Amino acid sequence: MLLPKRVKYRREHRGKMRGRAKGGTEVHFGEYGIQALEASWITNRQIEAARIAMTRYMKRGGKVWIKIFPSKPYTAKPLEVRMGSGKGAPEGWVAVVKPGKVLFEISGVSEEVAREALRLASHKLPIKTKFVKREEIGGESNES
C-alpha cells in the first residue's frame, strides 16, 4: 500500500476539486497511459488493486509507472456516534485526481496488451478514464 512516511498534520480539510489538473497531463515515462476524465479521490487500496490487475495481465512483461500518490489523509467517525466532539480519527489515504491527470503509464508491451491491461485497471477506479498514447498527447516517441 502507498502511504506517506510521515506527515506534518494527521488531519486535513477536505478541500475543493475545481478545475483541471495543472501538471502530470502527459505521458512522460512510458508509451501508453490512462488519463482521468473526472475529478475524484482515489484511495491507496484502489491504486494497488489497479496496479495488481495490470501486472497480472501483462505477466511480468513491460514496466508500470504509478503517477499519483495518496498523500491526503481522510478521517471518519465511528458508527453511531453523536455529532460534535471533534474531528474523526484518520481512516485512510487518498490521492486527489482532477480531469486530465495521467494515472498510470506502461511501456515494453504491445499496444493491444497495454490497452487491455489499462482497461482492466480502469475498472478498479471510481472515475471515467481514457487510453492515451505518447504521440497523441504531443510528446516524442521513445523509439529511435
Curated annotation (Swiss-Prot):
BP GO annotations: translation
InterPro entries: Ribosomal_uL16, Ribosomal_uL16_bact-type, Ribosomal_uL16_CS, Ribosomal_uL16_dom, Ribosomal_uL16_sf
Gene3D superfamilies according to UniProt: Ribosomal protein L10e/L16
Species assigned in the record: Bacillus velezensis (strain DSM 23117 / BGSC 10A6 / LMG 26770 / FZB42)
Disulfide bonds: none
Cellular component per GO, a single term: cytosolic large ribosomal subunit
GO MF annotation list: rRNA binding; structural constituent of ribosome; tRNA binding
Domain of life: Bacteria
UniProt-recorded name of the protein: Large ribosomal subunit protein uL16
NCBIfam families (UniProt xref): rplP_bact
Summary of the function given for this chain in its UniProt record: Binds 23S rRNA and is also seen to make contacts with the A and possibly P site tRNAs.
